[in-house]
Each structure stands twice: as structure tokens, then as C-alpha cells.
Amino acid sequence: MEQLVRLGDVCTVVSGSTPKTSVDEYWNGDVKWITPAELDADSYYIHDSVKHITELGRTKTGLSYMPVGTVILSSRAPIGKTAILGCEMCCNQGFKNLICTDRIFNEYLYHFLRAKTNYLNSLGRGATFKELSKGIVENVLIPLPAIEEQHHIADLFASVEELIQTKKQQLDLFDELVKSRFIELFGDQETNPYNLNVGKLSDVAEIYLGLTHTPTYVEQGKPFLSVRDISSGVIDFSNCHYITEEEFCSLPNGARPRIGDMLFCRVGTIGKPVIIPENTPEFGTFVSVGYLRRKANVNNYYLKSWMENDFFMRQVYDNVAGASQINLNTGWLKNFRILIPSMEQQNQFATFVEQTDKSKLAVQQSITELEELKKSLMQKYFG
């Protein structure tokens, strides 16, 4: 069993701050200034920030430059986002910044913090929103093997992460391949170089919207999905709400999609179409989710790629110009322009997509296996 030490004994923990937004002279300078919103699940080394402040803003706010190699940890909701600074920069108050001594390797610390996201969240304090104080972070215990072993452990995680990122890039390439094939077969949706039939969305699909009021949620029952449950590009039942069988049966047709229908996000991340696959259990939908039920003159693969095409979003922006929040409204969605190729052409495209999806599935299975390996390594080294 490795010795456990306090983070405060092997790191200097420093908080960030925000210059006054009302003082223009503090902003749009050359000083990199990062916020937690800029980090995601794959963040590792960070070399730039979205916002920059001036040297005057930094000094007047009392901000210190965080040195290269500093491990940054988001300490406000969401707690637990982490990265390593690849260059000198400043941070806002949403971070606790850990400057490592020579007793701890920063990449080892990075992987430890990623493994402990749930634990760190449990340490959050606050009535309005949870936050990790400097003292809480300093008192977190970490296993501390010899520095050579820390490097070895970090290298193991880096190898697995590199494989995962390579596989994810392969998935992105498959998606780009489908987009390219779509353009190759059907041309640009706006200029229509192949003189395909032009129609409206209502010519090829019926449009439905989910339940407009919030139902009564229960612990078990029929799944009831909102936009968060499909925005990843797949149907995710892991954190969805449930309603009773009785309430499900009383839902209007618009809130009861069926296998083969195509779900889409109406708010937030617009579009993100998902075709409901075979063997999916029955579920209801909230108004943030809509769905298309195709007609005989279109197949779902073509319809899905049409919604993922840039021309679709251009039509969205044309209809919501000036709106503070984008909502897909059936009043104008039904009139969206869509090219209608022959079913022979559409089916040719569908065959290509099906073959690509098989390849994607194999890659996704590899990613799942690598993620499980990473979890086992986290358990082995960090408990």
C-alpha cells in the first residue's frame, strides 16, 4: 500500500479571479485567461484560452501567472474538470490551481484527479451551488509512490488515452466520409447542381413535437426523454425520467414516437437526429424533442444526412434571426427546402451508410473496451 499524502503537502494550491468586466482596459489583451467552460472530458494540455485580459487587468485584479505544468481543477459546478497548462496563463475563480513540487509528477496528479471526479464532487460545499475550497483541495489524500513509478503510471494512462483518441478520430473520419458521399450523390442542397426534384420537409415527412407540459415523474415506469437524452447522437436511457404506464398511454401521438421515427433536438444543440432502432423500448418525449415520420418518397438515412447538412442549419438561422434562444418551430420547419432524389439514389446512399455504420460499431466497441481498461487502471492505482 502506497503512502497517502495531502495534496497541500506536495502542491501549492492557488485560486484564480476575474477582472472587472466593466473596465474595457482590462480585456482583450495578450494575457491568456482560462475558464472551466473551456475544458471538456478530453482536455489534457491547454495552450490557449478563449478570452484574454490585459497586463493592467491582471495586476489590478492581483492575478498571478500560473507556470507551465500547473494542474488546473474546476472547483465549481461542474466540479472535477482538469487539465495541464502547456504555457503560462491566468485562471478565473472557477479553478483551484495545483503547482506541483518535485515530489509529484503533474501528469500522475492529472490522472488521479480524473479518476476521482465523483469523490471530488462529494466534497463540494455550498447551499446555492457546490464548490471546493482551497482547504478542501489541500486535504485530499493521494497515493504517492516513488517519482519513477509515478511516471510509469502516467505513461500507462497516456498510452490508453492515445488509443482512445485515435479511435475517436476514426469515428469522425467515418462521419466525414458519409457527408462527402452525400454531396457526391446529391450535390449541394442549395444550388442543386443535379437538378433534383425540390420539395418541402412536409412533402417527405410528418413532423411531431413532444408533450408541452411536464408530466408527473416516478421512480420506475415508461422512459420519458428530453433533449439531454438524445443530444449525444444516440438514445441514452441512463439518466432519463420515468412516467407511469397510465400516463404514458394518455400521451398524444406527438409524444409517442415509434421504431423507425427520427428524433431531433428542438432546443439547445439543434438537430442531432437519431433514428429509433429496432428493439428500442417504448418511451415518451418532452416538447424539447421532436420527431419526423418519413413518407414513402424518402428513406431515413437520406433524411438524417439532410438534417446534418450545413444547409439545414442555414435555414434554421434564417428563421430565428435575432432570437435569444433557438427553437425549431414546426410552423416554419415544415417549409424547409429539401431535394428529393429518386428512391434508387437514396437506397444506394443508404447501403453505403449501413456499411459505414458497421465499421463504426466495431470501432466503438474498441473504445468501450479501452474505457473499461482505463477504469480498471484507475481502480488499481487510485482505489
List PLM regions with ranges.
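Non-catalytic DNA-recognition/assembly elements of restriction-modification systems
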Residues: 1-17, 139-154, 166, 170-211, ...
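A short beta-sheet element
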Residues: 35-36, 50-114, 226, 246-248, ...
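Residue-level recognition of specific faces of alpha-helices
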Residues: 94, 128-131, 136, 156-159, ...
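Short glycine-enriched, charge-decorated loop/helix-capping segments at active-site entrances
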Residues: 49-53, 158, 240-243, 354
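Low-complexity, Lys/Gly-biased intrinsically disordered segments
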Residues: 1-42, 59-61, 194-235, 248-252
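Active-site/binding-pocket entry motifs
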Residues: 39-40, 78-79, 119, 230-233, ...
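Specificity-determining recognition surfaces
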Residues: 96, 114-142, 306-338
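Feature detects amphipathic, helix-rich regulatory segments
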Residues: 61-66, 72-73, 88, 134, ...
